Amino acid sequence: MRHLIKFALLTITFCIGSSAIAGSVSRALFTIGVENREPVIMVDSIGSDSYNSISFFTELTDLSGHTVTHQWMYNDKVMFEKTFDVAGARWRVWTSKTLLPSWTGTWTVNVLDDDRSVLESKSFEYQ
């Protein structure tokens, strides 16, 4: 019986310690810019002849006290990362990337939590 109680307490402790973050990414999108903390002109593809930079915007809910990272990927390679400290129940952050004309193809931005687990992932085409 004593071993069963120890096992139960250990299981509860492990579950509490490894619980997933309760917050979420309520919006995640690509845009050509951000004004007044809001995205303008959402896009899922851009042409190298029209724009050479793009922004990734996220609105985070109930993640105060945590960090999130925008991880920009191209051809399975990390091209840029930016980590943010979340300081409110509703928090909006964005990153921007200048793209070279030779970097055409699929780009992905992963939103990572404190443990670098993927909270959200979005892709766009650069043509």
Describe each PLM feature range.
Residues H70-Y74, V111:
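Conserved aromatic beta-strand anchor motif in extracellular beta-sandwich/beta-rich domains
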Residues M1-A8:
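Bacterial N-terminal signal peptides that target proteins for export
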Residues A22-S50:
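Short, compositionally biased P/S/T/A/G/V-rich stretches that sit at domain boundaries
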Residues L99-L100, T108-Y126:
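Short, exposed beta-strand-loop hairpins at the edges of beta-sheets
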Residues G65, T104-T106:
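Extracellular Ig-like/FN3 beta-sandwich strand-entry sites
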